[in-house]
Amino acid sequence: MAEKRRFKKRTCKYCEQKVTFIDYKDIELIKHSLSERYKIMPRRLTGNCKKHQVMVEEAIKRARHAALVPYIVDRKRVIPNPFEELQPIYK
């Protein structure tokens, strides 16, 4: 019989950095939870804990409402990394 594969347990990167609040204006922090089409990625792919996943989802939804992140992206014009064009706010 084939042996079961052992998967490495993912750790929440927000817990590692001891993030207590995820702000919707901090695009650099929430961009890791968005796909190339600006969809919210699930917990099983990002490795976020439930508390931080809820905070990320709320921040992304608020950023969409404030027009900082688009709701949808045209399928014909998908770019590999949408955040390459953004200049860092903080230096």
Swiss-Prot record:
Pfam families registered for this protein in UniProt: Ribosomal_S18
The keyword RNA-binding appears for this protein: yes
GO molecular function terms noted in the UniProt entry: small ribosomal subunit rRNA binding; structural constituent of ribosome
One cellular component (GO) term of this entry: cytosolic small ribosomal subunit
Keyword annotations of the record: Ribonucleoprotein, Ribosomal protein, RNA-binding, rRNA-binding
Tagged with keyword Ribosomal protein: yes
GO biological process: translation
Entry-linked InterPro entries: Ribosomal_bS18 (IPR001648), Ribosomal_bS18_CS (IPR018275), Ribosomal_bS18_sf (IPR036870)
SUPFAM superfamilies linked: Ribosomal protein S18
Family as reported in the entry's similarity comment: Belongs to the bacterial ribosomal protein bS18 family.
NCBIfam families tied to this protein: S18
Annotated function: Binds as a heterodimer with protein bS6 to the central domain of the 16S rRNA, where it helps stabilize the platform of the 30S subunit.
Subunit composition and interactions: Part of the 30S ribosomal subunit. Forms a tight heterodimer with protein bS6.
Protein name: Small ribosomal subunit protein bS18
Native source species: Nitratiruptor sp. (strain SB155-2)
